[in-house]
Amino acid sequence: MPFLFAPAMQAVIPVRDSADFFPVRRVYGAAKNYAPDIATCKEKKGFNPPVFLKSPDCIVPVQDGATYLWPMPPRTSKIVPEFELVACLGKGGRNLTLDQAKDCIWGWCVGYDFTRRLTEKDLPTGGPWDMMKTLDGGAPVSAVRPAQKTDLSNPVAVRLYRNRELVQDASTEFMIASPEELIAQLSCFWELRAGDVIFTGAPVNVPDARIGDVFDGSVEGIGSLKIQIVSENN
């Protein structure tokens, strides 16, 4: 099959402690999926978080111990680095039950869902979130840890540091819709498939980012990821 120009490269994420790579098909995300405390979380059970898609080429795998330098995009008033637990699917389907949804999870990683706050001139009036969510290099992720080697049966800590100061100290216990519930919800609207990646939402009180800021996030038992915001011309 002749191409007019080289096709885009397949987005991939390395598998931890393996020579294999996880091929990315689609990238889904969830918003407003954490409560500030357990009581509020229980009150909101049954709430379906808003969901969105990011382009697969937003995915950037970051090596363990490395700091990902991400340039502030143009025409941006501020950037919000949403640090999240990420589910990676090894199979999919439609209208999945919770048990089926759980069985779809091949592995886990951590990642940042960068969100752009647009200048007032460019802000869409009630339109889609594409300009805010699909950013060049706007979804850096760690290596994927296979689900069979991961225990998420109990809540785990989700922490984010900005310039070595702890700015988020949360737990997956504060998650309103569990990863399985998110997967089941998504499967009602799209046919999920192997290679789909799902950002499960960020804890409340996500900090703003300025040029020069260094963020270091971790999910207990899954991984950590360090980034620095740099100027566009860096």
Stretches with model-predicted labels:
Residues 201:
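Active-site pocket scaffolds in enzymes
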Residues 1-189, 193, 197, 205-234:
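Catalytic-core "active-site belt" of small-molecule-metabolizing enzymes
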